[in-house]
């Protein structure tokens, strides 16, 4: 199929409607770099909200290089598990996302997450 890699998740921050906090270090992004140039990513990590609540995330991403001058394809599905209470609503929706690299300036990504209703 291709080359496998594991990239550690060193941390970061997140913010959105009703949520903000930090991405905790210790997660990992397992990657399969396919022979056709596409990448299949499976990232597992935890978030800590500004008020101390831990939320678990599994983000599965497909990244395809641009074809015929088009844009790069980088979309994901996210499984988000939060404890009951203030953030319990996260458990009751389907979430999708986009992924943008910040290279060459930083070895980091921006993930935009959308809740489907």
Task: Enumerate the predicted regions with their spans.
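Beta-strand-enriched cores of mature, soluble protein domains
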Residues: 1-117
